[in-house]
Amino acid sequence: MFSFAGEQDSISSDQPTEDPDSPRNRLSETTSPYLLQHQHNPVHWYPWGEEAFEAAREQNKPIFLSIGYSTCYWCHVMERECFEDQEVADWMNKFFISVKVDREERPDIDEIYMTAVQLITRGRGGWPISLFLEPETLKPIWGGTYFPKGRFISLMKQIQDKWVSDVKAILTQANQIADAIVGRLSLIQETIPISPEIIEKGTSSLLSRFDDNLGGFSGSPKFPMPMYNDFLMETSWDNLQVQKAVKKTLDSMFMGGMYDQVGGGFHRYSTDAKWLVPHFEKMLYDNGQLVSTYARAYELTGEPTYATVVEETLEYVNRELSASEGGFYSAQDAETNHLEGETYLWRELQIREALEEADMANEVSFTLSLYGVDGGTNFQDPHHKEEAPTNVLFLTNHPNVLASKYKLSYPEFQAKVDAVDKALLTVRDTRDQPTTDDKIITAWNGMMIAGYADAGRIMQNNSWVERAMEAANFILSDMKLENGKLLRTWREGKGGAEAFLIDYASLIHGLLAIYRANENKKMLEDAIVLYEKARELFYVSGEGWYDTEKGKSDLFVRTRALSDGAIPAATSFILGDQVNLLEFTGDNTYLEDALETINSESQWLNAQPLAVLVAAKHVDRLMKSHPDKFGSEPNSFVEKDSTVNMSCEPKTLELSAGESATIIVTLEMERGWHVNANVTGNEYTIPLSFTSIDDNLVLEIDWPKSEQMISGGEKVYVFGSTVTIPITLNLKQQSKGNMSIMARWQSCNEKACLAPEEKMVPCRVVVE
């Protein structure tokens, strides 16, 4: 394979934005905010479509393809450096047919050509995508991501020279790249039995990547990856290491600058390992998924800070991403006035002035300490070194610890913070604001709908469920065609391209989340209708689900991408829909469909569960509810639900540092069953134990007298029928968050033992 230009650069320069009164190109006829940003470029841009393809074929020119999105920082940089530059435009217009694609409107095109970039650059990817295509088949010749002016002109010259002198070699290379893409995105693999170890394998893979000090499952940059925490919470929550990993990660994320401390909502990712300095764009799909994640974490832990994150994020979405029609907008830009994060950054003087203006001068010291501003600046724009250093706001400690520091209850502390944030937000709103991409995307709305519904159900806020229904009804009425097909996008009263599998699957996910929250039958009925339409359009028996409809002439491959990214794979989403429809309807047709879906990605599930954790989470649900449908080897334990009912009194216990209190834990066994005692007398049996998740909480257990019995010819000590265990809790020092206690036991009868169980003691320990 031959190559063209050298390494891509990552330099930046500012050039004046084009005059809005200058002549417009063909992009002015589109509705995409991203394409409309380029309508005044001197480049003769075409939108993706037959007009562009025919022009390239008739003129015998390669196609230059640029793929990006409206809130992409480096897309803006390349526009300023290249596409607004007349010299670059002259080259593009003379030797190429230039095509612009909004990746959010056409995820199918983005998937194909991002794979091409990763193949060409040996794994590197990102936006903008900059590729040259052979015009007859639309196969990629060469390309990369961001190119500055000099290298871009050099690359265009090399492509043009090769096109004239050796087009045969170019076509050969295009075919080779395309074959590799087809092998990666459309390969049909042989079905193999699902191993029951995929959950353990996925869990251990995540825990091996866990950052004990800072939270998260990678080094820098750190992405939120809500599906990681969701997987751990749903499949392995009884594991103490899992609980610590999830809580540390969720705490670190909302305490850092990646969370908008003043306005709520999460930025795209953290540029560092500390979750401190974000890439400042905000995406609907991140916030929709993270609302569900934090709501679920609140449900499992009772931690009030997670509820606060949910409330603040939904307030942000209501305020800044809600469309008057009923749906949700897509995203907000990373930059303001060509400066990344300008709207969100603060200097000490600005904070003082904002609070003084709100008659809150007495809160200045508190605020500077709260958000780390009194420790000096922490942000220097890497692209504009001439700008003075400033501050990304972050929490200097966990809110529970800070509340204790100020001798406040958590609600009192949060009310104090809310008042400060309101004053800062009032001033911030007077600044120039990042651009909002105001198109409505069905798939992303599905995730946000689920976020509202999940939060409303868990936190018992019916208004959130109603907001989810409002968005769902808008899509079902305005973005659904008479033939039953969905539209992918909507903007200013106009629909865009038809939807893809991810749109159907995600919207069904949202509808079923509403149904789980309020049992609205219409939501369930609409979900069933959409599922049948999706099955008609995207499913092929014996092959699985495809991302696109068949017969698309502008695609040289019909993709079926299985791995999760920032958004779960469409196949993973549809599997979850099948499992939920099975649960809600009892119709075994959905079970059969789910098993076929699992078969289609069985090799991925067994070999790389970390890449398909969303699917693995749903497989785990089916393994538990329908173990007979999976061909795993029987293990040495009896397959049976728990025989033990655990209760605790009091249900809620309040503790302060240095205090002690006692809870009573009661285990009631089914008739004929017992649990092994705390000392079993047999090395092959699992003893009953209780463990504090927080080292600051010390347990003193008053073990009752056990019974002796003979099992397998050997003595073993057990607790039978009912056992009551007093446990004294000693809080050594102030800790952050509420605390939990884990119980572990093994149930046995005269013939067999069950697998060991780990469950949370149903007592809530509230740290005052």
Regions from the language model: what does each represent?
Residues 379, 591, 608-768:
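Extracellular/lumen-exposed scaffold segments
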Residues 2-447, 451, 457, 595-634:
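Replace the tail clause
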Residues 319-322, 477, 482-504, 510-645:
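Long, polar/charge-rich, low-hydrophobicity segments
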Residues 268-274, 331-335, 485-495, 549-554, ...:
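Short linear capping/connector segments at secondary-structure termini
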